[in-house]
Amino acid sequence: MKTAFRIGASALVISMAASATFAQDLQIENEDWWRTAGAQFEGVTIRGVTESTPPSSYISDVLAPKFEELTGIQVEVETTSWDQMYDKAIKDMEAGTGIYDMVYIEQDIVYAYLSRNFLVNLTDALAAKPEIAAPTYSEANFTTFADNFRGAEDGDLYGVPMEAFIKVYLYRTDLFGDPEIQAAFQEQTGRALEPAKTHEEYAEIAQFFTAYYQEKGEEIWGTTAQAHTGHPASWYEFFESVAPTYGVYNWGIDPANNYAASVENGGRMNSDEAKEALAWWLSMRDIAPPESVQSTWTEVGTTFAAGRAAQGLVYGENAAWIASDESKSRVVGNVGVALPPLEEGVLEAAEAGEGYIGYYDGGAFGLPVGSQNQDAALLFLQFMALPEVQEEWAVAAPRITLTSTYDSPKVQELNTELGGYYDMLRDQGRLFKGAPEYTFHAQLREATAPIFYQILTGEIAPEEGLDQMAAKAEEELTNLGYRQ
């Protein structure tokens, strides 16, 4: 989950690609079909609102002009901050004013939108209008990330994915591969230096690097930490990226057991595993760079890119520019990717579909039911998901939402530069999961986050804090009517 302060430097868009793709260079198959399909919408303008991120900028700068050229339909895409985007979209959909024909939907908010019937069923809409169903658009081509935007009961699609990435374990290949460092680590620990598979191994590596460079007087630490003491980024790091690696899923809440959060009532928010996870994470924070206590997802990325950490958990969209953009990163060519460290049995549970090992984030474009230009918007949403469009988009603003995109030669070339990140996304993305399907997402976070911040600042002991958070979660769920 990233609600604000996401990296959104528009300079990243297109510049990351070796050869920039502009609207006039984008080659679309079946151009005549698009011209014919768009002819009936002459004079129509469709409007969208989205967060200012590299993928969104590609929509406004490249896809919209190309779509206009082919169909004659004007496209206005408003890119803004997350809070402004959310505020504008939600107010429009609540009032049914039809200002926007397309809205950005973050993975973790879609369940609230579906519960309020804000979005058009795209599967049904296209089935009812075969004359505007693009011949090369296919729901079957979407990656499993699209499942986050399907209705729980009908399985139909309510949003076209436009960005998707996992939170991965990044490590410095130049440091891990340095013979002098390898020898020192071997002598100290009795084992070879390689990316950690367990939390114990990760901690050992982090402690080694922090001490190693402290002795040398250099500003390199053993790990990153997304541990801001007053921003939800830290809450999300723990519940979405750390707790699952200890086998604590869905924030430790059990919807099938009267939405229990506390161990006393059958939940796991304050379980022994959750407390062990928190103790481990706090110990890593304590040997991370000093800026970690004020770091959100953005600052973690810049810390790693500045060469100030040997390893860390980093969002995939940031991992891409860290590994490839020399104008912003000092570690280009020296970045490896791996699965996060795990407790015993967690990987096996994820492979069996009984758990997950980390966070799968991203968003989609949805069509509000109040839109007055639904058919024209349906055309554009399909256009976004064409295989030839997605190939260029994946190179310009690293993200993949179609399975066919992985096989593109351009994408494979970039995959090498990114240390195999796209291979991991393709082959092991199924082991990661988005936010729980909770319509009370924001309310529960806001109710418990203040206690979490008190843990981070040392006002409350970690174990006591988790006990208080579990009790507060159940109180909030009772007030909201979920817990009886």
Q: What annotation goes with each model-predicted range?
A:
Residues 23-47, 68-69, 153-156, 210-219, ...:
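Immediate post-signal peptide segment of exported/extracytoplasmic ligand-binding proteins
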Residues 24-40, 107-168, 238, 336-341, ...:
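Hinge/lid segment of periplasmic solute-binding proteins
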Residues 28-34, 45, 51, 335-344, ...:
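Long, aromatic- and glycine/proline-rich binding clefts that accommodate carbohydrate-like moieties
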Residues 31-37, 54-74, 174, 448, ...:
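Short, polar/charged alpha-helical segment
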Residues 62-142, 179-180, 311, 327-330, ...:
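Extracytoplasmic "Venus flytrap"/periplasmic binding protein-like
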Residues 65, 150, 155, 175, ...:
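Extracytoplasmic/periplasmic substrate-recognition and gating elements
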Residues 80-88, 197-201, 292-306:
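Short helix-initiation/N-cap motifs at beta->coil->alpha
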Residues 201-210, 241-294, 336:
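Glycine-centered hinge/linker elements that transmit conformational signals in sensory
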